Amino acid sequence: PILSAYVDRSSEVWFEQEEPGVVAHFNPFTGVVTREQILIEYSNPERSRPAFHIHEDVNGYLWVHPYGGGFSYFDPQKKRLVPFYNGLGSRDWRFSNKIHSAFSDKQGNLWMCTHSKGLEKVTYRNVPFSMMTPVPQEYESLHNEIRALCEDKQGNLWVGVKDGILRIYDADRTYKGYLTENGIISTVGTPVKGTAYFIIQDSKGVIWIATKGDGLIRAEATSPSGMSYKLTRYLHQEDDMYSLSDNNVYCVYEDHNGRIWAATFAGGINYLTENEDGKVLFINHRNHLKGYPIDPCYKARFITSDNNGRLWVGTTTGAVAFDENFEKPEDVQFYHFSRMPNDTQSLSNNDVHWIIPTTDKELYLATFGGGLNKLISISEDGHGAFKSYSVQDGLPSDVLLSIREDDKQNLWISTENGICKFIPSEERFESYDERSITFPVRFSEAASTLTAKGNMLFGASGGVFIFNPNSIRKSSYVPPIVFSKLTVANEDVVPGEQSLLQADIDDTEQLVLSHDENIFSVQFAALDYTNPQNVQYAYILDGFEKQWTFADKQRSVTYTNLPKGEYVLRVRSTNSDGCLLYTSDA
């Protein structure tokens, strides 16, 4: 028998049946009647069975709960119901599919009064982030902690892992093998010695591998397939002043003149050249780079060039800059920029992890503990002026690890507390933490790359973190703001005939306070239920304040000893994605 019927937006007719877990639907265009039965868990027959329920949400989903249980959504492509929770009987089945009621709000959040769990909220979002894990069975281990990333000109991805194995994946990210000591990419054999900390491919197609403790490796392809390489390892030799200055190579870089530079963690910087006999020489502080400030800046971890003819070195004691268009290394003049306690325009922190020149010819420095620094100017006498950005400006953490620029000139920064996007034109940050990413991630130092397809790859303790910046969309939802409570002299004000409030505070347009009621608080809330803990607020009392007060996530404001007058309280908020949309209430 048919107990009730419902016609959905597409004119499909749904019939309630008295058999538990069973529902029928009729397509008037095809004349087909389909009977569906959803598996439900056993329950005591003496208990009342949950009722039939059906509704459609703002995203066009049709939700059906047959009599007795089996909460499902309708797949219009496959023309069948799909159980909302894990399949009954599967090992990870956790939830009852029996509900008493369901409701979808204006944002599409699904609210359910369930048979056993009480009230539950389900939110939906596209997840543009993914993780490529070298050894899936060991999520956070040395086998998955990424220290170096490079995409070569054939689209192969070179992945340096902390376990010392340099893995290579093809353009489809299928595992090809690892680099062996004899230069072959294979799944067998002795891995090439050394943990890769930085990898580049130069303009001639040569792969350069910076290792921690095992020097610098030059890998020149010996086959068109890119499966074999001639390897040359360069090491520090105490009795050879033209050898590599230190075996701990943290970064390798090719400048605009084709020079290869190596930043070492105990010997400053080097660049490679050759003598008349073709022998490779490393030019460093021990021979011709006499001007390099080796004593304070011997721990170099990064090197790059800007768009103004300078090379920049990131060290643990600040940044070093010099002209890259030199003829004699002895004549190079170096400028050292560091944190000066009484200079607000100096670097915010001396531990510089990453430096990036942008398309708009700006330069940004990522520090380990001092946030982001933007170069403003360098005076003729070598004094640098910087503008710093910290957690107070929207960064999720002041510990920054690496930066990449997308095709819209936004900067993507891996931090100790998630990843964020910096929009230079607006000087604004958008953060993505574990709640946005939907899985835990802990980023590694100085491991990132931008692929030819525009994908961003960042190294993490659990693998390669992957996303395409153009696929990330912030919510445009504008939440209404309501006033939720009024407190006068630390006493809650309840509406009533003898009260200050004749109606609820949110329905009150005007409030009159006497001279002895000049200490009061107002609570407010933006009705965004997706991630309400991320909503941030600002307020202003017109007639008393001239600037907005940014209250972060605080949802109340208190005023004391206001002088006589008329005032208007206005409140603004972001939505739960952190977008400031200038919603207001007064």
Model-derived features: positions:
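Carboxylate-rich, polar loop motifs that coordinate divalent cations or form catalytic acidic clusters
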Residues: 1-584
